[in-house]
């Protein structure tokens, strides 16, 4: 009797102290040597742990190959849900996976993790990836047949479309049944795409139906979907990629319509806040000032006071101080002992504001090219702003730029901390801004070639 009791105590103690492992193998390894593990909660990432990548060389088919390996331990109290292993600060530098009280192991290429990840341990992740591959293979055939039918209106194509549609429904039903009671069941149900029972006759009908039914199988009330990247990823695709127009005004309208449609589907306060914050951040990254203003006025400012963050709003608006649709931030400078201000200049129908530096090799090459080109556009007043540590080299350089307004900005510690430079939130030099006569920013060309293209087309 005592032996049985002791065995039971040992068993229950081992259960209480049980740990799960998350192991990843990079092939080939990334440049960095660190990985951070997060749990996804809403639209945010909750830090859990970090690990160092250990490098190993193995022989595969007689050739040496370097692998990068990392591992994490999760306690028995770790909650099921969506997790993320991040190995890079920017870009697609992470692998998302599900944890549901089981060990997780995967192999991937860090350059394209989504396409390459292979789970070698974890029933949940293996099944979900198997489902995605099976479903997407059939969906690809359906998409191809839909495109073909628009071109040919063939009865055989329509028949093939219906056959593949039945195959897709069978795949969906099979994996929903296989995943019954599992964490990934909610994601398998929500990953289903809308397909009409018959192929559409034209592109517009197809796009309209796809847009109207994009969220047909998405449960916005699901906590499992909320605590993952799934909802945000779907919303991102719908708002920014499903509808697109080359016309900027039309594109702004499409973005607003898409966001309005999304917000109508959300009834949860916590999801509403998460989506609003995400969309504002995404639009800010895209430097879409008018859309961000609209988001603040239409949604953010109407949130309960406790859900608003003054610092969040200020940060986003500061980033957008100098973007298309905004009045260019004002600054002053001296020319021949005379004071000038950008806001009061009145010597051009339009203005080209260019930020550059004598310490920038691209600038040294592009500014003379720009100067030569702008001689053919005398109706445009050019304001060049040198970002410098000191004035001597700049003084000599601008002697070759007569007829331009040449301003300079310095800073005792770091030239890019100059007040004017910070207002324009420059991502690099040279940076170009086209202003109308009222100093509204109307274009932000990326390179000198884009400046030339803009003014040449403007002259036509």
Q: Which sequence ranges carry the predicted segments?
A:
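Short active-site neighborhood of thiol/selenol oxidoreductases, capturing the structured segment around
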Residues: 341-370, 381-383
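Charged, long alpha-helical assembly modules
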Residues: 191-268
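N-terminal "domain-start" segment that seeds a small globular fold
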Residues: 306-343, 409, 453-460
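Helix-turn-helix repeat elements of alpha-solenoid scaffolds
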Residues: 161-167, 248-257, 288-291
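Thiol/disulfide oxidoreductase modules built on the thioredoxin-like
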Residues: 191, 413-456
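Structural microenvironment flanking redox-active thiols in thiol-disulfide oxidoreductases
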Residues: 364-401, 414-420
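Bacterial Sec-dependent N-terminal signal peptides
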Residues: 1-25, 460
């Amino acid at each position: 009797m005592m032996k049985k009791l002791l065995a039971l105590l040992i068993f229950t103690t081992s259960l209480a102290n049980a740990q799960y492992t998350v192991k990843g193998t990079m092939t080939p390894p990334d440049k960095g040597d660190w990985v951070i593990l997060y749990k996804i909660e809403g639209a945010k990432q909750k830090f859990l742990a970090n690990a160092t990548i250990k490098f190993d060389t193995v022989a595969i088919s007689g050739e040496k190959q370097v692998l990068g390996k990392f591992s994490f331990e999760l306690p028995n109290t770790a909650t099921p849900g969506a997790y993320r292993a991040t190995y890079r600060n920017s870009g697609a530098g992470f692998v998302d996976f599900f944890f549901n009280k089981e060990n997780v192991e995967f192999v991937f290429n860090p350059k394209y993790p989504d396409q390459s990840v292979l789970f070698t341990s974890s029933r949940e992740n293996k099944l979900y990836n198997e489902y995605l591959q099976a479903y997407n293979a059939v969906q690809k055939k359906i998409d191809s047949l839909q495109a073909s039918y628009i071109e040919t209106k063939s009865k055989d194509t329509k028949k093939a479309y219906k056959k593949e549609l039945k195959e897709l429904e069978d795949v969906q039903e099979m994996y929903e049944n296989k995943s019954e009671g599992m964490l990934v069941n909610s994601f398998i149900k929500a990953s289903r795409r809308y397909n009409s029972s018959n192929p559409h006759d034209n592109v517009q009908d197809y796009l309209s139906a796809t847009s109207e039914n994009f969220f047909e199988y998405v449960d916005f009330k699901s906590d499992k979907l909320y605590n993952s990247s799934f909802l945000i990823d779907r919303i991102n695709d719908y708002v920014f990629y499903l509808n697109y127009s080359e016309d900027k005004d039309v594109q702004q309208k499409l973005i607003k319509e898409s966001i309005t449609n999304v917000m109508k589907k959300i009834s949860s306060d916590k999801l509403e806040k998460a989506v609003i914050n995400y969309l504002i951040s995404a639009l800010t990254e895209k430097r879409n000032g008018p859309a961000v203003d609209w988001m603040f006025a239409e949604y953010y400012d109407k949130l309960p006071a406790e859900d608003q963050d003054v610092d969040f709003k200020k940060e986003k608006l500061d980033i957008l101080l100098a973007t298309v649709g905004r009045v260019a931030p004002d600054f002053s400078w001296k020319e021949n002992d005379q004071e000038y201000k950008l806001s009061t200049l009145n010597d051009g129908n339009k203005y080209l504001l260019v930020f550059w530096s004598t310490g920038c090799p691209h600038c040294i090459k592009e500014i003379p090219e720009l100067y030569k080109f702008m001689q053919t556009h005398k109706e445009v007043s050019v304001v060049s702003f040198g970002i410098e540590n000191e004035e001597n080299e700049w003084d000599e350089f601008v002697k070759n730029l007569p007829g331009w307004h040449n301003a300079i900005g310095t800073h005792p510690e770091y030239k890019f901390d100059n007040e004017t430079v910070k207002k324009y939130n420059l991502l690099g030099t040279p940076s170009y801004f086209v202003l109308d006569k009222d100093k509204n920013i109307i274009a932000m060309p990326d390179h000198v070639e884009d400046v030339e293209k803009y003014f040449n087309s403007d002259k036509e």
